[in-house]
């Protein structure tokens, strides 16, 4: 796993962010189990609550060519600062990568079980 390249891809993605309100440019980069590298950025609009986090932009890219599973993800600001996913995005990442998905964190790469302990998932839904 080349975390340096993944982090650089996240910074590059942040350069494309549309963030005229918060001015927080966010980029996410993820590695798929089949080797694909995905990149996405955040996008805001004037009705503040309807913006999209960078991590959400990864999902259509993952599933459009046929799916897969995320195995590693890094999130960075436009200045290269490490950013952790918000709570909503942590749930999304759990769905797309499961407990083994590695997330870049201040302590280095950690599994989703540390980022979202006791996660809610499909097993919690009625059969």
Locate predicted features:
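A general structural signal for well-ordered alpha-helical segments in protein cores
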Residues: 7, 55-59
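C-terminal binding/interaction regions
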Residues: 2-16, 65-127
